Swiss-Prot record:
The protein's role, per its UniProt record: Catalyzes the transfer of a ribosyl phosphate group from 5-phosphoribose 1-diphosphate to orotate, leading to the formation of orotidine monophosphate (OMP).
List of residues binding orotate: T126, R154
Statement: the UniProt record of this protein carries the keyword Magnesium: yes
Gene expressing this chain: pyrE
Name of the molecule in the record: Orotate phosphoribosyltransferase
Catalysed reactions, as listed in the record: orotidine 5'-phosphate + diphosphate = orotate + 5-phospho-alpha-D-ribose 1-diphosphate
Quaternary structure and interacting proteins, as annotated: Homodimer.
Family the UniProt entry places it in: Belongs to the purine/pyrimidine phosphoribosyltransferase family. PyrE subfamily.
Transmembrane segments: none
Organism: Desulfatibacillum aliphaticivorans
Cofactor entry: Mg(2+)
Length: 187
């Protein structure tokens, strides 16, 4: 299943360039760019992501799974759907980029209660900034962040930064795995 996801990502979501031409959130230019949305929002990609994320969190005894909108949303929803299919339902939630300014003011959207155990997910990690923001906001709403799962680790220190806040942090796929598959596909 993991190799199928890697191949799917290479076909739908990964771009490489000889020169640094892809602007990252940090503002830095990179030769490697991955936009996971075309993969995750495809029915087969959603199935693969959901099941692989659930495999990564199955021992954590979670109540919820979510992260910062929009990158984490399809990952969390795929995992929540897969959790129901697997007979161990876990609720999805989304963390706003800006707090809701009307009604009940809050960062977290979804059926989550203070004290519940959650995993924070993200589609891609470079520096870890977005994932760390999600962890901090989830904790500020009283959620216990027990695990962090990243779909693609660019292997630029972000996963290690996340692990400083959530020691149980892991990635489903690494940049090295994508590069290896990309090179095989291009031969």
């Amino acid at each position: 299943m993991k190799q199928e996801l890697i191949d799917f990502l290479c076909k739908k979501s990964v771009n490489f360039s000889d020169e640094p031409s892809f602007k990252l959130v940090s503002g830095r230019l990179s030769r490697f760019y991955v936009n996971c949305k075309p993969t995750i929002l495809h029915p087969r990609g959603m199935y693969l992501v959901g099941h692989l994320v659930m495999e990564a969190v199955k021992e954590a005894k979670l109540d919820g799974i979510g992260g910062l909108t929009f990158g984490a949303d399809p990952v969390a929803m795929a995992a929540a759907f897969a959790s129901e299919l697997m007979g161990c339902p876990i609720k999805a939630f989304s963390i706003r980029k800006e707090p809701k300014d009307h009604g009940i003011i809050k960062w977290v959207e979804g059926d989550m209660q203070e004290g519940e155990r959650v995993a924070v997910v993200d589609d891609v990690v470079t520096t870890g900034g977005s994932t760390i923001k999600a962890i901090e906001r989830a904790r500020s709403q009283g959620l216990e962040v027990a695990k962090a799962v990243i779909l693609v680790d660019r292997q630029e220190g972000g996963l290690e930064n996340v692990a400083k806040l959530v020691p149980d942090a892991s990635a489903i796929v690494t940049r090295a795995e994508l590069l290896e598959a990309w090179n095989k596909l291009k031969k």
